[in-house]
Amino acid sequence: MRRVFAMLQAGMMLNPGLLAAAPPPPTVKTTTPIRHLVIIFQENVSFDHYFGTYPVATNPSGEPHFKAAAGTPTINGLNNALLNNNPNLNPLNLAGATNPFRLDRSDAATNDQDHDYTPEQAAFDGGLMDLFPLNTGTPGPPPGAPPIADTTGLVMGYYDGNTVTALWNYAQHYAMSDNSYDTNFGPSTPGAINLVSGQTNGVIQSLNGSGSIVPDGNGGFTLNSDADPVGDVCSTSSGETVQMGGQNIGNLLNAAGVSWGFFEGGFNLSIVNSNGSTGCSRSTTSAITATKKADYIPHHQPFQYYVSTANPTHARPSSVKLIGQQGDGANHQYDILDFYAAIRAGNFPAVSFLKAPGFQDGHAGYSDPLDEQTFIVDVINFLQGQPEWANTAVVINYDDSDGWYDHQLGQIVNTSAVPLADVLTNGSCGSGATALPGINSSTLHAQGRCGYGPRLPYMVISPWARRNFVDHTMTDQSSTIRFIEDNWLDGQRIGNGSFDTIANSITQMFDFKQVDDNDLFILNDKTGEVEFSSSSN
């Protein structure tokens, strides 16, 4: 409670009664009460890796305690059969064959798993979901974890509400999905591109190699792995870089005069960190992982891949008042600190994409769930202290699964048949004959976009979110685009083969007939425990 009072004195929280008084921007029309959407786009987590045993936590002594509220809905998680007789006991997994097992809070720092396009499909084994250790598993957490974690069986590990405490508490108070997916199989860059365009076809330039692209079946190429954006001053000078054609959601928002921005840690190259690092080498060493990581990671910044929305030199906004607006040299691409500065100056963009500094983005190998928790909680606590909170929604979503085990096979809504790349079932991902189009009208069925891929967490946090609600509607990363299009753009779609044309809505996670005007739900950014709640839930 002392922390709550400190935040009140610092201006981080407002009188709850003032929340309803926040006026909507006069020039922006929306179809819902949501005037500000903040997308926190994190890294490399499958649904079961964070929520497999929700809402039941082990609660060992000395760790943050979690107890679910009465009436908490059930989820499609790890049932007794999956926990005790899992298909990944398959002997083909060799020493890594194992049931799922709990990773303790002290095991927050783990190795990165294999999460490329083809290994993820191979792990699914035609829907048997039984070859994760063989295909995506990588050993290596710190000492003290179960011995199986020193094998490829680490991929079967999961956290519960004693480690990912904040996310479990947000799920109790707001809305989550247990049926949301990576739009395609594969790693960070395709996931980031799908977040903003729903279309990984249309690579128009590839330099220094071609390992991240596959033929689309019509003379063009589809992005299915990681590569830095062409022209970004922080991109690799020797590794592969690519550039995308087509439109993204930023183009549509610009045409409609809707303010928006992508805010990523480390984007401002003039800042000097406390360790003396600056420029593209700005870095932070996590106390949890003991790993130094660059704050800015080029292949996590999707708008940099499009000439129309790129800020290749990382030019600074000419004024805090112009953040989110057209015609400024920053071209809607900013540092994460600019997000806070703009809102404090009374300039809250309608649509904001947030990317944490590397050490806080949740990516195993250099980040972890505890550093990630600090970032997420700090953002949401800050937003709840703003007068605009009454008309704000926060989406928490992920770019890929990192290859971590999840038991649920999603529906394959888009097929692909690229030899050697697509191996989901019998050497392909369906026939590819019904695949969505590419960005060019002549590419009727663009290959290399097998999906939906692995199941990922998806949460909505807002005074308008349903309380303690689990949505079972099938959604994907491009469902966020669809909400933006429906709310600000009168349902206009990106088109040209974008998944936004087939994505389901997230509106069922809201209750637009009822709002909690006094909504405040403040968590501790280190433990994830509730420090203040204005409601009983």
Regions found by a protein language model. Name each.
Residues 2-10:
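Sec-dependent signal peptide recognition
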Residues 4, 16-20:
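Hydrophobic membrane-targeting alpha-helices
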Residues 9-17:
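Hydrophobic core
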Residues 20-537:
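N-terminal pro-sequences and low-complexity stem/linker regions of secreted or lumenal proteins
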